[in-house]
């Protein structure tokens, strides 16, 4: 049994494991099943300045080997991840998920930079700092949020928050006059790399909005926003309204075209059905006509039968046995009407002559 089972396992097709959207592996593109769990976080992650910290215990950083083994058991590994988190999207959530799952027992601290630092070093944001704090607070992987996080991490900040490792993608982040703001963290052995999610970023989202600015401006005008709120001039407002009407007319024309195409298609289908039915009926009619009036049709047989009956009625055939002529044929003792008396016993010569004459008369009557 063991040999058979091992042979079956070896003969199976090797399935490719691909990371799924939920971080689990997928087999041949099919998401792996997970057990349904109704337990979830009911409160947002607290801010760091709202948590009481026991500074009486000394801060001893955990090494990478100990963190991977899940030790020490008395406390989790404290991992720090920072960012701007403007227009919080799935790329941010995936990065925080990776940071949370770096070690078996992880406590994730997320630092969010303020508007002042962000505007000075990176540029203007769509969301203000309070909105960005709130967005990160409600991410399920976050255990603690640090407001007004520093742009460059200092030893004092790391010691204050008792940070063991810093999680970020390993692409050099040049800013604030430095080629890589995480260079000293990497040199200290505290850097834990994560993978960036391709195809999604705050800059990409803003690019989409700017690229289709007219579409979104018309959309918001249609939903009740004023031109002043959208910072749209009077001329552009009228232009957008006109474009909206033109689009409605185009949509109606397109609907009419589609309906007309459907109608024409239905008519064509009906006409094809009618033609097929007409062909079938015409074949049946021609077949029945030929059966009745063709060379070997029923009508010809009827005429032949009628003609035969008429001829039989006009001149019926007489059978030789029932012919009246045969019944009236004279016997050998035929008497001539002009002979008055019966002659006495005739001679043999006269009798033979009478027989010959009688036979000739009988043959003439039959003819």
Curated annotation (Swiss-Prot):
Region ranges (Amphipathic): 228-287, 298-315
EC nos: 2.7.7.15
3 X repeats: annotated segments: 319-348
Residues involved in phosphocholine binding: 122, 151
Pathway: Phospholipid metabolism; phosphatidylcholine biosynthesis; phosphatidylcholine from phosphocholine: step 1/2
Regulation of catalytic or functional activity: Interconverts between an inactive cytosolic form and an active membrane-bound form. Activation involves disruption of an inhibitory interaction between helices at the base of the active site and the autoinhibitory (AI) region. Activated by N-methylethanolamine. Activated by oleic acid-containing phosphatidylcholine vesicles.
Modified-residue entries (Phosphoserine), positions: 233, 315, 319, 321-323, 329, 331, 333, 343, 345-347, 350, 352, 362
Modified-residue entries (N6-acetyllysine), positions: 8
Protein name: Choline-phosphate cytidylyltransferase A
A molecular function GO annotation: molecular function inhibitor activity
CDD domains hit by this protein: CCT
Chief place of localization: cytoplasm
NCBIfam families referenced in this protein's UniProt entry, alphabetically: cyt_tran_rel
Segments for region (Autoinhibitory (AI)): 272-293
Membrane topology according to the record: Peripheral membrane protein
Region Disordered, annotated ranges: 1-31, 313-367
Role description: Catalyzes the key rate-limiting step in the CDP-choline pathway for phosphatidylcholine biosynthesis.
Swiss-Prot/TrEMBL GO biological process terms: B cell proliferation; CDP-choline pathway; isotype switching; phosphatidylcholine biosynthetic process
Localization (cell): Cytoplasm, Cytosol; Membrane; Endoplasmic reticulum membrane; Nucleus
Keywords, sorted A to Z: Acetylation, Cytoplasm, Endoplasmic reticulum, Lipid biosynthesis, Lipid metabolism, Membrane, Nucleotidyltransferase, Nucleus, Phospholipid biosynthesis, Phospholipid metabolism, Phosphoprotein, Repeat, Transferase, Ubl conjugation
Residues recorded with modification N-acetylmethionine: 1
Annotated positions binding CTP: 84-85, 92, 122, 168-169, 173, 195-197, 200
Subunit details: Homodimer.
Residue ranges of Sequence repeats: 319-324, 329-333, 343-348
Family under the similarity heading: Belongs to the cytidylyltransferase family.
Reaction equation(s) it catalyzes: phosphocholine + CTP + H(+) = CDP-choline + diphosphate
């Amino acid at each position: 049994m063991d040999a058979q089972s091992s042979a079956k396992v070896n003969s199976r097709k090797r399935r490719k494991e691909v990371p799924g959207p939920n971080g689990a592996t997928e087999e041949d593109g099919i998401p792996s099943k997970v057990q349904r769990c109704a337990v979830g976080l009911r409160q947002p992650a607290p801010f760091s300045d709202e948590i009481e910290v026991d500074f009486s215990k000394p801060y001893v950083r955990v090494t990478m080997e100990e963190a991977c083994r899940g030790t020490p058991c008395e406390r989790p590994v404290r991992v720090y991840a920072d960012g701007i988190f403007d227009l919080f999207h799935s790329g941010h959530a995936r990065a925080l998920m990776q940071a949370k799952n770096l070690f078996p027992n992880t406590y994730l601290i997320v630092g969010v930079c303020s508007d002042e630092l962000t505007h000075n070093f990176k540029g203007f944001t769509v969301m203000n700092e309070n909105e960005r704090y709130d967005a990160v607070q409600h991410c399920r992987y976050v255990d603690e949020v640090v407001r007004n996080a520093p742009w460059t991490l200092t030893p004092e900040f790391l010691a204050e928050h008792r940070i063991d490792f810093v999680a970020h993608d390993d692409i050099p982040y040049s800013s604030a006059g430095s080629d890589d703001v995480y260079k000293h963290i990497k040199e200290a052995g505290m850097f834990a790399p994560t993978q960036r999610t391709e195809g999604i970023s705050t800059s990409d989202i803003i690019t989409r909005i700017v690229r289709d600015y007219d579409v979104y401006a018309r959309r918001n005008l249609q939903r009740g926003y004023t031109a002043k709120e959208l910072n749209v001039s009077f001329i552009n407002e009228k232009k957008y309204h006109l474009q909206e009407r033109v689009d409605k007319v185009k949509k109606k024309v397109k609907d009419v075209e589609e309906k007309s195409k459907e109608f024409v298609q239905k008519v064509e289908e009906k006409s094809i059905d009618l033609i097929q039915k007409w062909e079938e009926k015409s074949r049946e009619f021609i077949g029945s006509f030929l059966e009745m009036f063709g060379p070997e049709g029923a009508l010809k047989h009827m005429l032949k039968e009628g003609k035969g009956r008429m001829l039989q009625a006009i001149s019926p055939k007489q059978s030789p046995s029932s012919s009246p002529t045969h019944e009236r044929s004279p016997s050998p003792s035929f008497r001539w009407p002009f002979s008055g008396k019966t002659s006495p016993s005739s001679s043999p010569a006269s009798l033979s002559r009478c027989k010959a004459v009688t036979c000739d008369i009988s043959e003439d009557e039959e003819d």
